[in-house]
Structures are given as C-alpha cells and as structure tokens.
A protein has these predicted regions:
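Extended, charge-rich, solvent-exposed interface segments
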Residues: 78-87, 95-101
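Acidic (E/D-rich), amphipathic helical modules within compact regulatory domains
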Residues: 12-64
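Structural detector for short beta-strands of small beta-barrel domains
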Residues: 1-15, 61-81, 108-110
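Intrinsically disordered, low-complexity regulatory/interaction regions
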Residues: 1-5, 45-46, 107, 114, ...
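OB-fold/S1-family single-stranded nucleic acid-binding modules
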Residues: 53-68, 113-125
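Long, low-complexity intrinsically disordered regions
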Residues: 81, 90-91, 105-110, 124-125
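A short macromolecule-binding patch
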Residues: 27-31, 88-94
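Short nucleic-acid-contacting surface segments enriched for D/E, G, S/T with interspersed K/R
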Residues: 33-47, 96-111
Length: 125
C-alpha cells in the first residue's frame, strides 16, 4: 500500500447495494465511486482491509451471477431508477447517475442479481 500502513484487520462480507455487510451484520460503507466504477451489485463478495491509520481498502473477491437487461431511466420521487421490460424497478447509485449523466427517458444496459433491488449501469444506449 502506498502509505506503508500495516493491515490492522481484514473483514469479508457481501455488498448490499450501498454497503458491505459482514457475517455478524456489521455495516461498512463502500465508497460510491468504487462501487459504481466496479459495477458492484448485491451479493458480490468483498474483502475490506482496515489499515492501522484507519484507511479502508475494498477489493471484490467474487462475483454473484449477473442478470443483464435493457431498461429505461425513470424519475421516481426525485430519485432516478431503472425500469426493465417486465416493469421491475431498480435503484442506482448517485455516483453512477452523475458519471453517465443519466436523465429520465434514457435507455441503458444494466445488470443486477437475482432478486436484486439495485442495478449497475453498463452503458447508455
């Protein structure tokens, strides 16, 4: 690691759409820019390395099976969501919305997990 701080603790958990949740149910916030850039979806396995200076380093260690779909961006109660062809709606991270400059009506390629409530955007169509 760049700052040469030693690893104090390593924790494993699952991504819930916004956070990593470990086996005991403890929640660790995942930076939205990392989750968005890595296209994390619910169920992905993460490793968190906590350095002695308190710095968090997340690493994805396993991918959950992805369901790919084409959806349309909708504005719901001042939050953008992605609606698939079957009418299911998925939440999207704010960082993803900003990165892709998503607006209502845009068509996107996205992916989610079985039973997922969150989607990762792959591309704007």
């Amino acid at each position: 690691f760049q700052n040469e701080a030693k690893i104090l603790k390593t924790v494993f958990g699952q991504f819930d759409g916004q956070n990593m949740v470990d086996e005991q149910g403890k929640i660790y916030p995942v930076p939205g820019n990392y989750a968005s850039k890595s296209r994390l979806i619910e169920g992905d396995s993460l490793k968190l390395m906590i350095l002695e200076d308190g710095t968090y380093f997340f690493k994805r260690v396993d991918l959950v099976q992805r369901i790919k779909f084409i959806g349309r961006v909708l504005d719901r109660d001042e939050h953008l969501v992605i609606k698939d062809k079957e009418g299911r709606q998925y939440r999207v991270l704010e960082e993803t919305i900003r990165y892709f400059a998503l607006q209502e009506g845009m068509e996107v390629a996205a992916e989610t997990s079985e039973g997922g409530r969150w989607a990762a955007i792959v591309n704007v169509i």
